[in-house]
Amino acid sequence: MAKVNIKPLEDKLLVQIVEAETTTASGLVIPDTAKEKPQEATVVAVGPGRTDENGKRVPMDVAEGDVVIFSKYGGTEIKYAGEEYLILSQRDVLAVVEK
């Protein structure tokens, strides 16, 4: 994963989608029309966290390199330097995949 010159603001994350499998365990090819929208991504960059009502930063629950599962319809798709990314709010992240 290459370093990206995009720094998310507040409680935003920049993630790169983990591509879904194109074949089943038995070797059948899954056509694009039957694939579900992926919900797993690798965190590329993390914002500093939102500011609470007292002006203090609330730390982020995820870090660069984490693999996360996110809400199916969350985020904004962007293209940068020929790569596709998604900008998510921390609230769109449902879980961190433990290694």
UniProtKB/Swiss-Prot annotation:
Signal peptide: none annotated. Keywords: Chaperone, Cytoplasm. One of its GO terms (biological process) is chaperone cofactor-dependent protein refolding. PROSITE patterns: CHAPERONINS_CPN10. It is found in: Cytoplasm. It holds the Pfam family Cpn10. GO terms for molecular function: ATP binding; metal ion binding; protein folding chaperone; protein-folding chaperone binding; unfolded protein binding. InterPro entries: Chaperonin_GroES (IPR020818), Chaperonin_GroES_sf (IPR037124), Chaprnonin_Cpn10_CS (IPR018369), GroES-like_sf (IPR011032). SMART domains: Cpn10. GO terms for cellular component: cytoplasm. It comes from the Bacteria. The keyword Chaperone applies. Gene3D superfamilies: GroES chaperonin. Heptamer of 7 subunits arranged in a ring. Interacts with the chaperonin GroEL. Together with the chaperonin GroEL, plays an essential role in assisting protein folding. The GroEL-GroES system forms a nano-cage that allows encapsulation of the non-native substrate proteins and provides a physical environment optimized to promote and accelerate protein folding. GroES binds to the apical surface of the GroEL ring, thereby capping the opening of the GroEL channel. Belongs to the GroES chaperonin family. This is Co-chaperonin GroES. The gene is groES.
